[in-house]
């Protein structure tokens, strides 16, 4: 990639998660901070690309069942109306590693990343006109979301997404590096 990750000072929460992640990474290197941030960045970009391409098959491979069902309904609604939602990432996303639950149980083990990104986001109708979303002045938007990632067959996928305000609890949730550690 031509552009590397955005460098910034990590938050206190991110430093605490990274310390716990170093312990978790001894058991599974995919939990290491650099590995999680790289995987989250790749996944975020791939999800945006697949959404822009209206590629439900690719989306299905990258997200959990509930999220896929919700997105599939939205894509079908766009198609029914003759609309296409276009999204394009502007620059690199900022990824903060803010949550960790690693007990060795694949059903509950997860990481949480906070994503801050700028996107060009608009809808094109059947006639090729660009439709603005209500309440927006232009096509450029900034998203701040908490993505919960889980693993399946050794690959991270998006289990859930919370918008900035609804995801704030993620910054308070317990950090668990292993089945024997329980740091609050």
Give names to the regions the model predicted:
Residues 70, 98, 103, 121, ...:
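Residues in flexible loops and secondary-structure boundaries
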Residues 72-79, 99-107, 176-180:
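Short, charged low-complexity intrinsically disordered segments located at boundaries
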């Amino acid at each position: 990639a031509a552009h590397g990750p955005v460098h910034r000072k990590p938050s206190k929460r991110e430093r605490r998660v990274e310390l716990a992640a170093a312990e978790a990474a001894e058991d599974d290197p995919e939990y290491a901070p650099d590995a999680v941030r790289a995987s989250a960045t790749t996944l975020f970009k791939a999800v945006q690309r697949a959404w822009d391409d209206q590629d439900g098959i690719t989306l299905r491979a990258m997200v959990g069942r509930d999220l896929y069902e919700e997105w599939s309904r939205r894509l079908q609604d766009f198609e029914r109306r003759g609309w296409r939602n276009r999204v394009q990432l502007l620059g690199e996303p900022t990824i903060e590693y803010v949550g960790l639950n690693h007990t060795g149980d694949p059903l509950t083990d997860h990481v949480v990343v906070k994503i801050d990104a700028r996107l060009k986001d608009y809808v094109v109708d059947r006639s090729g006109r660009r439709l603005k979303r209500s309440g927006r002045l232009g096509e450029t938007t900034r998203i701040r979301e908490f993505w919960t990632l889980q693993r399946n067959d050794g690959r991270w996928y998006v289990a859930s997404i919370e918008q900035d305000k609804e995801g704030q609890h993620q910054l308070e949730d317990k950090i668990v590096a292993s089945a024997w550690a329980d740091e609050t």
